[in-house]
Amino acid sequence: MEVNIINVNSDRIGTIDLNPLIFSVNYRPDILKMVVDWQLSKRRAGTHKAKTIGDISGTTAKPHRQKHTGRARQGSLRSPQFRGGAVIFGPVVRSHAYSLNKKVRNLGLKVALSLKNSCNKLLILDSIDVNFVKTTQVLQFIKNFEHKSFLIIDKDYNKSVVCSCRNLHNVTLLKQIGTNVLDILRHDCIILTVGAVKYLEERLL
C-alpha cells in the first residue's frame, strides 16, 4: 500500500509502502472495545474505600442485654443498621487491572491504525526533530488540515519538540513505544513519522 510522505509545508516529497497487515486490517469494533476497556481499567486508581466494622472507632460493648427488653437483639453499635455504622460489601482499595492477551492488544492497534487510514486521517511526515522547533511552526503545519485534534507519533524526539507542542491543546506528542488504541481513537488525525512507521512494523509483525 503506497502512501505519500509530506513535509511540514504539506508538500509531497515521496512515497512509502505501508504493510497491509497493519494498516489495512478489517474493522473489528469488538476488539477495539476490549482493548479500550483494558486500558481504562489499568488507568483507574482504585483508591475507593468504605469502612468495615473493624475500621470504625467506638465502643465494642453490647448496647443492651440479650433478652427481656422487647427490642431486637444487638451486638454492636458499629453494625451497619446504626447511624455511623459500617458498610457491608463496600468498595475496598484494589487494582482494577487485568491481563489481556498480547495478540489481542496488537490486533487492536492494527485495527485502530487501519481505521484512521481508511478514513484518510493518517498522515506520514518525514521528520519532526528539525522542523518542529517553535510552537508557531507546529501551529502553521496543523492549520493546513481541517482536523480537530492531532496525535504525532515519532520513534524519538528531543526537548525542543516537546516544548513546541505542549502549549497546543489539540496536539499530543507520543513516542512510538507508547502508541496505544485509546489515544489513536481519541484524536481526529494521526501523524506518523517515517521512523515511527518502521518501528511499528517491527513491533507488530
UniProtKB/Swiss-Prot annotation:
Compositionally skewed regions (Basic residues) per UniProt: 62-71
Highest rank taxon of the organism: Bacteria
Q: Provide the GO MF annotations for this entry.
A: rRNA binding; structural constituent of ribosome
Q: Extract the Gene3D superfamilies matched here.
A: 3.40.1370.10
Q: Alphabetically, which GO biological process terms does the record hold?
A: translation
Which keywords appear in this protein's UniProt record, sorted alphabetically? Answer: Ribonucleoprotein, Ribosomal protein, RNA-binding, rRNA-binding
Region called Disordered, residue ranges: 54-78
- Keyword Metal-binding assigned: no
Q: Which cellular components does GO assign to this protein? A: ribonucleoprotein complex; ribosome
Please name the Pfam families in this protein's record.
Answer: Ribosomal_L4
Q: Coiled coil located at which positions?
A: none
Give the protein's function. One of the primary rRNA binding proteins, this protein initially binds near the 5'-end of the 23S rRNA. It is important during the early stages of 50S assembly. It makes multiple contacts with different domains of the 23S rRNA in the assembled 50S subunit and ribosome. Forms part of the polypeptide exit tunnel.
According to the record's subunit comment, the protein's assembly and interactions are:
Part of the 50S ribosomal subunit.
Q: Say which family it is in.
A: Belongs to the universal ribosomal protein uL4 family.
Write down what this protein is called.
Large ribosomal subunit protein uL4
Which organism encodes this protein? Ehrlichia chaffeensis (strain ATCC CRL-10679 / Arkansas)
Q: Coding gene? A: rplD
